[in-house]
């Protein structure tokens, strides 16, 4: 059984465009970098070089800020006053159940189509989310190939036992999507941060840094510690795209679809909570009739509350 995906949901297209328009004016620019083997890997004095492909950004920060402010104005969000390369974080708020994962995966495809960006890393806080993202990539494969004219792309879950996938990520000129758990690269003891023979004597993270990848952070509120922020910044991102329904910090927010918006647009169902009524409950208001007296002016009753 194949799942059919709706490709023209207005709010999803708006969320995608709110990211892609940040780079309006960017020309396709693929930069090449050289990876040189270390001395230990040289054979008979011959140096074996590899050529990697990195994301290249031509826009200045003033261009990014101008594009960002136009998006924020259009979407009724607070305008960012200043921005710099170290602060290229952009937040998308989407209510649970509205297709957040689909949106950021399709955003990847659009960024590749429009600007030629090829290196993307999806950072997740847990194994469950990691497996969920990979599954979504599997079931959307035919859908995206149809939408994007059989665009060739590779996706994989980072595995510390398969370091060669990092080198392939760096040298491939096809669209590359890596999924990685934050715990796999936020400590010095992680394999990715250590020199390895499989990586020609380099630390595998050095390959990633040279790629200048676009980072997508899924559920960033779970990765707001200083250690997590430092780890993500060491990937040398071109920019960081943050997707959640419950952001702790909304860095340069570009799109908002909260629970109220989702309900008003009939994207999620309303939950009704019924009141609880106890049967045979003796814990009710107490009243006791003490006496009744007939008088000339009427009837008097004495009660105990």
Q: What role is predicted for each listed range?
A:
Residues 1-305:
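RecA-like P-loop NTPase motor core of helicase/translocase proteins
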């Amino acid at each position: 059984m194949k799942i059919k995906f709706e490709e023209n949901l207005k709010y999803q297209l708006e969320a995608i465009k709110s990211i892609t328009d940040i780079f309006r004016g960017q020309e396709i620019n693929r930069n090449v970098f050289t990876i040189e083997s270390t001395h230990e890997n040289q054979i008979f004095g011959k140096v074996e070089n590899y050529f990697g492909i990195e994301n290249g950004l031509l826009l200045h920060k003033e261009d990014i800020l101008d594009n960002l402010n136009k998006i924020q104005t259009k979407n009724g969000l607070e305008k960012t006053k200043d921005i710099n390369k170290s602060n290229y974080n952009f937040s998308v708020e989407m209510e649970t159940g509205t297709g957040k994962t689909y949106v950021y995966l399709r955003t990847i495809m659009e960024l590749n189509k429009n600007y030629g960006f090829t290196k993307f890393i999806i950072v997740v806080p847990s194994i469950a989310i990691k497996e969920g993202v990979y599954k979504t990539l599997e079931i959307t494969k035919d859908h995206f190939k149809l939408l994007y004219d059989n665009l060739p792309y590779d996706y994989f879950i980072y595995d510390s036992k398969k370091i060669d996938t990092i080198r392939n990520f760096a040298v491939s000129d096809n669209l590359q999507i890596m999924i990685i758990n934050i715990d796999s690269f936020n400590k010095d003891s992680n394999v990715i941060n250590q020199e390895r023979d499989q990586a020609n004597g380099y630390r595998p993270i050095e390959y990633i840094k040279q790629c200048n990848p676009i980072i997508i952070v899924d559920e960033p509120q779970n990765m707001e510690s200083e250690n997590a922020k430092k780890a993500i910044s060491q990937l040398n991102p071109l920019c960081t795209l943050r997707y959640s329904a419950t952001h702790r910090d909304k860095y340069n927010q570009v799109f908002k679809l909260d629970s109220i918006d989702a309900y008003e647009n009939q994207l999620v169902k309303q939950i009704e909570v019924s009141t609880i009524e106890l049967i045979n409950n003796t814990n009710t208001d107490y009243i006791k009739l003490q006496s009744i007296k007939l008088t000339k002016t009427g009837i008097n009753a004495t009660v105990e509350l």
